[in-house]
């Protein structure tokens, strides 16, 4: 496999806050270096359920993850597995749920916090965190610049074809402060500023890039149900592919087949949605 793509998931950012507060991403849209669409989360619009949908291309009603309290090793084929089957190298820097869904369950703190498994059928290079002890006051999230740097390190050291990064910072802060607040305005600005220097590095290394969220949040910092604030987020794409008209709404089940299409890998038979990129 000679194609490369990175998926960056900023957990819990509603569409309006992406478009209003991420000045670097929006600047690249204005310059023509990126394109942006609205992205609609599955139902329930709960984090774990959305993680599973993003990578399997099927709804929670099919893959079976009904919420954060129901995490298990998924049976459906996923982006990691399909990339590996086509000869690609995979990596993930993310919450431990991702390792449990797509590699091993339950998560072993010592064995699974960091691994390099060249023969794995799913995730070759994993760097995970659990957020154990998470609460309203202490959100237990790593520094995002450290996560971006870790993904870059994996790309350079191991030649990833597909890498994904997931950070819970903005979701956790949104639950505490709600998204219509000075604290969240600043947090989104800081996230945008920390992410921005890595975008040119990844592009220079030959990666296409998708930046999005798993779901949004409403005025009270809630998500899990139906509605524009809970379900709708933005999706930014950096790369040469042609995409749909700007007013198109991307369904979450389209992400997995789109990523695999851009990598030149075969989508699983269970991934029925069409790629939104040519």
Could you tell me what each predicted segment is?
Residues 1-278:
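Feature captures the catalytic ectodomains and active-site-proximal regions of enzymes
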């Amino acid at each position: 496999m000679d194609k490369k793509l990175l998926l960056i998931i900023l957990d819990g950012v509603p569409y309006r806050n992406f478009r209003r507060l991420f000045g670097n991403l929006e600047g690249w849209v204005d310059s023509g270096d990126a394109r942006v669409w609205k992205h609609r989360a599955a139902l329930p619009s709960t984090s774990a359920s959305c993680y599973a949908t993003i990578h399997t291309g099927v709804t929670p009603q099919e893959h079976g993850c009904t919420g954060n309290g129901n995490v298990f090793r998924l049976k459906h084929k996923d982006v990691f597995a399909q990339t590996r089957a086509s000869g690609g190298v995979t990596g993930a820097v993310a919450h431990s749920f991702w390792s449990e869904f797509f590699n091993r369950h339950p998560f072993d703190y010592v064995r699974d916090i960091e691994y390099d498994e060249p023969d794995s059928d799913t995730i070759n290079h994993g760097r995970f965190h659990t957020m154990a002890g998470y609460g309203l006051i202490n959100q237990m999230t790593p520094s995002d610049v450290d996560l971006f740097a870790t993904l870059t390190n994996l790309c350079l050291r191991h030649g990833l074809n597909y890498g994904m990064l997931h950070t819970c910072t903005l979701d956790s802060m949104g639950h505490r402060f709600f998204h219509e607040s000075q604290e969240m305005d600043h947090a989104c600005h800081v996230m945008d500023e920390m992410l921005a220097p890595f975008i040119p590095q990844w592009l220079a290394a030959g990666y296409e890039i998708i930046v999005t969220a798993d779901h949004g949040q409403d005025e009270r910092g809630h998500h899990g149900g139906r509605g524009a604030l809970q379900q709708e987020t933005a999706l930014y794409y950096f790369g040469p592919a042609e995409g749909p008209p700007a007013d198109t709404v991307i369904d979450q089940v389209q992400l997995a087949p789109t990523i695999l299409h851009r990598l030149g890998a075969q989508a699983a038979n269970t991934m029925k949605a069409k790629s939104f990129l040519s």
